[in-house]
Regions:
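A structural signal for short, well-ordered beta-strand segments
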Residues: 11-13, 86-88
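Core segments of cupin and vicinal oxygen chelate
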Residues: 13-65
């Protein structure tokens, strides 16, 4: 897993089980370097049912000035539908920077759509849908 030293904002796509196929297609169109990490290849597999181990935990495509990330839909209580499959992705920086931005964007958000920042095997992770319905994913270094 990679992290930027500074905060970075890129699009983040969510797929319904076909993330690897879609990202491979995008690579064939855009060229560049594609990395795909499946659930089975991460410590997350110990917290997920075996039928989800083939899914993509994180994919990243970078080609010249084009860069975006993606995942297969993994939230057990929400389902993908048009309108919630594209999000903003804030990656990198220090925990305190992520926390400040997360808390600011969470102001007025529907609490049912907020997954607070928490330490995960790959670093800090969190998600929220802001007061306008825009989904934001956060990933970075762990809290000190």
């Amino acid at each position: 897993m990679y992290f930027y030293n500074m905060l970075n904002l890129t699009p983040f796509l969510l797929f319904d089980g076909n993330c690897a196929e879609a990202m491979t297609f995008y690579q064939s169109c855009l060229n560049g370097e594609l990395t795909i990490t499946k659930i089975a290849d991460t410590p997350m597999k110990n917290h997920m049912p075996p039928q989800q181990h083939h899914k993509v935990a994180h994919a990243h495509l970078k080609s010249s000035g084009i860069e975006f990330s993606a995942t297969d839909w993994l939230h057990p209580k929400r389902t993908p539908k048009p309108g919630n499959t594209v999000a903003m992705y804030i990656n990198g920086g220090k925990y305190d920077e992520l926390r400040k931005i997360f808390d600011s964007l969470a102001t007025g958000a529907d609490k049912a759509l907020v997954d607070d920042l928490q330490d995960m095997p790959f670093g800090t992770y969190g998600h929220l849908a802001d007061r306008y319905g825009v989904h934001w994913f956060f990933q970075g270094g762990k809290a000190a």
